[in-house]
Amino acid sequence: MILSDKTILDYIKSSKIIVEPFDESSLQCSSLDLRLSNSIAFYEELDIIDIKSPIQAKTVTFEEYFIINPGEFLLASTMEYIKLPEFITAFVEGRSSLGRLGLFIENAGWVDAGFEGQITLELYNANKYPIKLYKGMRICQLVFAKLDEIPSKVYRGKYLCQKGATPSKIFMDFDKK
């Protein structure tokens, strides 16, 4: 069941869902707009990406804005730090207004029940023009859904409590035996 604005607000006010900082004007009828932080990360020139090995990414902070060039892929993060209870999951959706400019936001937009942290966004500029993005702008929407029952496993993965634009940790999947 997708949560309405009334339920989202009730859950935030009762601390069932944590959103810091919370801006009530970001609440939509069935979602919460999240804002762009000042942290981005990108992968520097590589011959090949070996997913079994840690991949170094350059993380930078910006004061007011950054420009994403045509065909460029980078990671960004939300300003908001969220914490979901064990009975709520969420979907990250790009904003239509940005999609209409050719900016693709996220390709891994699932937030598991029990997740805590800033959300890393995967950004890609499919336009033939550079796009200027500003710190604090509404960048994506978070749609909350209530699970039919408490799961036997809640999220305790490698991105728990992440802050800032967090590069891939897929190499850790290969360490599991």
UniProtKB/Swiss-Prot annotation:
Q: What EC numbers are recorded for this enzyme?
A: 3.5.4.30
Q: Which SUPFAM superfamilies match?
A: dUTPase-like (SSF51283)
Q: Which GO terms describe its biological process?
A: dUMP biosynthetic process; dUTP biosynthetic process; nucleobase-containing small molecule interconversion
Q: Which domain of life is it from?
A: Bacteria
Q: Where is this site: Important for bifunctional activity?
A: G109, W110
Enzyme class, broadest EC rank: hydrolase
Classification via Pfam families = DCD
**InterPro entries in the record:** dCTP_deaminase, dUTPase-like_sf, dUTPase_trimeric
Q: List GO molecular-function terms, semicolon-separated.
A: dCTP deaminase (dUMP-forming) activity; dCTP deaminase activity; nucleotide binding
* Range of residues in the leader sequence: none
Keyword Transcription regulation carried by entry:
no
The free-text function statement in the UniProt record for this protein reads: Bifunctional enzyme that catalyzes both the deamination of dCTP to dUTP and the hydrolysis of dUTP to dUMP without releasing the toxic dUTP intermediate.
Instruction: Give the protein family.
Output: Belongs to the dCTP deaminase family.
Protein's name according to its UniProt entry: dCTP deaminase, dUMP-forming
Originating organism: Hydrogenobaculum sp. (strain Y04AAS1)
Q: Which gene encodes it?
A: dcd
